[in-house]
């Protein structure tokens, strides 16, 4: 597998340190609001990455944090007259509702910043001892210029960064480029005891600490949204490598933005759509499909027309898979296997792997699934084939969709049995020329959104 490494700006063969435990860290949400679909893109994309690595035989330790103390959380708590804990707990629960709806698997560990204060303080003290950090009136800052490699992830020379840097009112930095590792407590804000007095951690140091505690000083892969490259990930590298004296992450993956009318979606711009409000209208699975339907590095434009297209694409997949179940149930053991068709079905797996091995190209991976759908529709459902052929197609269909994390809302067996019983009654009525009963059952099914279709194997049904 090759991935585009943001650090080197080129595709590289992915060679983890230990194939039995690939160490991946993904930046999680700052929990002060519902997640919008821009937040959901890395959730779904890197969930597919994890699934695919496991599919290819790797063991994966996947860590994704919650930033549960932050200026935005404190601001929200003050506005609502609540504690920061109440705000963070509320939105962690809401996050899980959305993540489970999107079929995003839980990480191996979901650490919280507030649970890792000791580790954070330990790293800051190490940086201070090495001369990379300094304290001023309870604040602690990182000496950016002392890190000779600073800017290597964002590919920005220090001179360019310098021109845009400034010192805010009340800050006592040595240099405008320096950033906060620890913030002295302000009246009414939450705080922890530290060697520098009461305060709380800066955002960047939280991730460095959780990375080191749960994955060690060097990890295989760090991922997140493109907006995190600078300053967040750049600062993580600086802190971690200066404190630990070794490479922080061997590979970096960043997903592109979601745009609304070609402008980046963000909470600060107020042009965002929450996952929850879109899910209420279209369901979570349509959102997941939308988020993985394009290559993860390309920006994607959000509009209702595209969401409708994704809904239709999913319906095609469900229709095909349900029809395949019916064909399998009615396939005759007397029908011989077709070796060429079996080989052609297997070839779709190769096409899928080729796509996904090329920098997690889910767009081409989905195309491979639809090529399989075409073969199923034209060579299996419209013909008489053996049970082995039907089973091979069904197994591969489930295998590939499982890697993508889609088709997780298939009909329940109880509902299937009830509908198929009604279809059988209708068929019996037609055979007995009781067309009034047959029409009544057909109309009842239609009212429930069930569409019937005659095929060589019998009557199949789908949801409208």
Language-model regions, residue ranges each:
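Alpha-helical recognition segments enriched in aromatics with Gly/Pro capping
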Residues: 1-32, 47, 97, 118-325
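N-terminal, positively charged nucleic-acid-binding surface of large information/translation enzymes
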Residues: 8-11, 17-105, 457-461
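Short phosphate-binding/catalytic loops that engage adenosine nucleotides
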Residues: 58, 132, 450
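Short, glycine/charge-rich beta-strand/loop segments that flank catalytic centers
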Residues: 66-70, 92-95, 105-120, 137-147
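The substrate-binding groove and active-site-proximal loops of carbohydrate-active enzymes
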Residues: 78-84, 108-114, 225
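Structural preference for alpha-helix termini/caps and helix-kink/transition segments
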Residues: 264-265, 271-464
